[in-house]
């Protein structure tokens, strides 16, 4: 199934953090926090302004982004755990 978000919504796949610390200690799933970094999978066309014009989003598919701990709504699409959030929930794009 292909999913296209509406308006200023963005679909993000979380990027999982390391399973092990630098010192070699393995972190169990129960002690891990949900990652706040992800890859943009799909973007909507943008929000409309008062004149009805569509304002394009600043992020695009493939961007690596940072977002808040409680941002977005968790969904499962084609067996993948994804987040749908507004572009305003994204704090920034990570330059690689």
Swiss-Prot record:
Keywords: Chaperone, Cytoplasm
Self-association and partners: Heptamer of 7 subunits arranged in a ring. Interacts with the chaperonin GroEL.
Cellular-component GO terms for this entry: cytoplasm
Predominant location category: cytoplasm
Protein name per UniProt: Co-chaperonin GroES
CDD domains, alphabetized: cpn10
Purpose of the protein: Together with the chaperonin GroEL, plays an essential role in assisting protein folding. The GroEL-GroES system forms a nano-cage that allows encapsulation of the non-native substrate proteins and provides a physical environment optimized to promote and accelerate protein folding. GroES binds to the apical surface of the GroEL ring, thereby capping the opening of the GroEL channel.
Subcellular location: Cytoplasm
One of the protein's GO biological processes: chaperone cofactor-dependent protein refolding
Record InterPro entries: Chaperonin_GroES (IPR020818), Chaperonin_GroES_sf (IPR037124), Chaprnonin_Cpn10_CS (IPR018369), GroES-like_sf (IPR011032)
The family this protein is said to belong to: Belongs to the GroES chaperonin family.
Organism: Methylobacterium radiotolerans (strain ATCC 27329 / DSM 1819 / JCM 2831 / NBRC 15690 / NCIMB 10815 / 0-1)
Span of the signal peptide: none
GO MF annotation terms: ATP binding; metal ion binding; protein folding chaperone; protein-folding chaperone binding; unfolded protein binding
């Amino acid at each position: 199934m292909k999913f296209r978000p509406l308006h200023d919504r963005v679909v993000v796949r979380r990027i999982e953090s390391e399973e092990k610390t630098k010192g070699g200690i393995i972190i169990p799933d129960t002690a891990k926090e949900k990652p706040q970094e992800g890859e943009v999978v799909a973007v909507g066309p943008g929000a409309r302004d008062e004149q009805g014009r569509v304002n394009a989003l600043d992020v695009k598919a493939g961007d690596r982004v940072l977002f808040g701990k409680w941002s977005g709504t968790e969904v499962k699409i084609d067996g993948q755990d994804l987040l749908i959030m507004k572009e305003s929930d994204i704090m920034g794009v990570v330059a690689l």
